[in-house]
Curated annotation (Swiss-Prot):
This is Large ribosomal subunit protein uL16c. HAMAP family: Ribosomal_uL16. It comes from Nandina domestica (Heavenly bamboo). InterPro entries: Ribosomal_uL16, Ribosomal_uL16_bact-type, Ribosomal_uL16_CS, Ribosomal_uL16_dom, Ribosomal_uL16_sf. The gene is rpl16. Part of the 50S ribosomal subunit.
C-alpha cells in the first residue's frame, strides 16, 4: 500500500474539500482514465484495491498509472477513551480528491478492455466517477 517515506509533521488538520480540482485533471500518460465526480478522501487501501483489479483484468497487456498519492495522515483515538489528552495517533493515509481529478490512467489496450477494467476499479471507489478518453 502507498504511504509517504517521511513527512515533516506526523499529524495534520482535517481541512475541507472546497471547489474543483485545477491540477491533475487532464490525461497525461495513457489514453483512457478514471475521473472523480465528487470530493472525498480515498484511502491507500482503496487505491491499491482499484489498482489490483485493473491489473488483474488487463493481465500482461497495457500499462496502468496511478495519478493520486495518499499523503494525508488520518488519526484515530483508541476506543473508550475519554476526551482530552491530545490528538490520536496516525492510523492510515488518505488522498484528498476533488471533483475533476484523474485517479487512474490506462494505455496500450483496446477501448472495450479499458472501459471494463476501469469500471471494475470504479466500483472499488467510494465516489461517483466517469470514464474519460484522451483527445
Amino acid at each position: 500500500m502507498l504511504s509517504p517515506k517521511r513527512t515533516r509533521f506526523r499529524k495534520q488538520h482535517r481541512g475541507r474539500m472546497k471547489g474543483i480540482s485545477y491540477r491533475g485533471n487532464h490525461i497525461c500518460f495513457g489514453r483512457y482514465a478514471l475521473q472523480a465526480l465528487e470530493p472525498a478522501w480515498i484511502t491507500s487501501r482503496q487505491i491499491e484495491a482499484g489498482r489490483k483489479s485493473m491489473a488483474r483484468y488487463a493481465r500482461r497487456g497495457g500499462k496502468i498509472w496511478i495519478r493520486i498519492f495518499p499523503d494525508k495522515p488520518v488519526t484515530v483515538r483508541p476506543t473508550e477513551t475519554r476526551m482530552g489528552s491530545g490528538k490520536g495517533s496516525p492510523e492510515y493515509w488518505v488522498s484528498v480528491v476533488k471533483p475533476g481529478r484523474i485517479l487512474y490512467e490506462m494505455g496500450g489496450v483496446s477501448e472495450i478492455a479499458a472501459r471494463e477494467a476501469i469500471s471494475i476499479a470504479a466500483s472499488k471507489m467510494p465516489i461517483r466517477t466517469q470514464f474519460v478518453i484522451a483527445g
